[in-house]
C-alpha cells in the first residue's frame, strides 16, 4: 500500500486489548475505564481484517495492547497469525509486552514463529518500577525476559525516558542489556491522553537523557533498520545496540511505514493524529467491499507527519486518546 506521500505501508500494529495488569504513569490513568467486551474485535474479526491487509501488502504485524497477553485465549490469535508466518504471507510477527506473563507464554510465541519481542521496562530498581507501573512486580518481568531468551526469542527492551524519574536508571539498564544479549531502545514521552501537562514536565530529550552514557562510551551510527522508527547506534566497549525513538526532538515521519488497528476496530494512520476510519461497523454489517473502500480511504488520510508540536502549542488540539487505547 502506498500512501499520498509515496511511503510504502507494510507494517500493521494490532492492539488486541486496552486492558493491562499495570498502570504505567505515562500510559494511562490509575482509574482507567476500559471498553466493554462487546466493543472489542473478536479474533475471527481480527483475522478477517488481517487477511485483507495482507492482500493489500502488509508484511509485518506487531501485537500490542494494553498488555496483549492478558486477553483471554490470546493463544488462539497468536497461533492463527503464526500460520501466516509459516506460509510466507507475513515476513514478521512480533509483540510488545510488559513481560509479566512472558514466562508463561514464551514457548507458545516461539512455536508460532515469533522471533522477537519488545519488553517495556523503564528501570531495574524494584521500588522505582513499582512506582512507575503503579504496583507491577519487577521479578516477574525479569523472569519473562529470561524465559524468552531461553526459547531463542530475541528481546529488545523499550525504556521510556522520564525526567527526574529514571535518568539514573540508564547506566544499569545498558549494562543489563549488554550482559544478557538484549537490544535497548530509548523512547521520548509523547503528549497523549489526560495529564498531558504533567507529561510535558516529565519530558526529556534523548540527547540529554543519554548524556551519562555518552560520557563513558563512544557511539557509532549503525545502518541497521527495524520495522520501526528507531535510529540505531553501537555503544563501544559494551557491545550494545542502542535504538533512539525521538518523536519530539528528531522527527522521523518521512519514513513511516505503519498503520494501527485499535481493539475496537478503528484504523489510525498516525499515533499523533485523530484521523481514523471505523472498520468494525463494516465488518459487522457484512459488507466486504466497504472494508476495502475504507482501507483506501485510510491511506488517503495518513498525514505527512505527526502533529505533536501543534498540539502542545494549542491545548484545544491535544489528543484525548491514551497510549493503551491506540497500541503505541
Question: Language-model segments: which ranges?
Answer:
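A short acidic, helix-capping loop that chelates divalent metal ions and anchors anionic groups
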Residues: 32-36, 125-132, 193-197, 278-279
